[in-house]
């Protein structure tokens, strides 16, 4: 019986895509004759192939019990319109970063100590962007996160009242200059974001290898310099800018 060959060759003409320099297309399209060897698969070989986002899983369940130091949060509903009633396009709708804790795990073991989760069921919390796994429970959006992904507890609608967790700090960002030294007003987009501010609140500290809390080296009232692209930024009710970051992102205390 003659053997069946799984490869074949053919001559292809490939048009290379144009490159872009800024917004100007670089001219020139070249043709390349290529001899290619490829398996002769049928279309049936690709049936059932589904590409999904690896970081997000959405399923429908009626009960979810977090394990270890994980926390189940019922997320706030995305605002689809402004306070004046104008509907926002999907791209302009801000993804919520807060919600209510509805279930917690048993905690984690550090050294010889078994430490409970730092937040309780019913607490209103704020968590880091782009974290956790989304899941639908009883028709509502929920998020499963690790305790360390929770920034702090917020019992009001104003971020200035945030109680940071672990090694995090709440910082009120220094105000940006509205004018140049020559008196010209600066456009909002041209204002350079400052990387220093005043510490408003601190977390209880980091855990050592034995599960004991180590106090943070900064305290409320300190003016600190921090890494430019660190942390999560928030806007207070009065329009003030706030930053929540880890103490390891603080470079110096200013005085």
Swiss-Prot record:
Chain coiled-coil ranges: none
Annotated region described as Cpn-10 domain 1, given as residue ranges: 54-156
Functional description taken from the UniProt entry: Seems to function only as a co-chaperone, along with cpn60, and in certain cases is essential for the discharge of biologically active proteins from cpn60.
GO molecular-function terms, A-Z: ATP binding; metal ion binding; protein folding chaperone; protein-folding chaperone binding; transition metal ion binding; unfolded protein binding
Gene Ontology CC terms: chloroplast; mitochondrion
Quaternary assembly: Forms stable complexes with CPN60 in the presence of ATP.
Keyword Cytoplasm included in the entry's annotation: no
Gene3D superfamilies documented for this protein: GroES chaperonin (2.30.33.40)
Classification via HAMAP family: CH10 (MF_00580)
UniProt family annotation: Belongs to the GroES chaperonin family.
Organism in which the protein naturally occurs: Spinacia oleracea (Spinach)
Keyword field contains Chloroplast: yes
Transit peptide as recorded in UniProt: 1-53
Name listed for the protein in its UniProt record: 20 kDa chaperonin, chloroplastic
Locations listed in the record: Plastid, Chloroplast
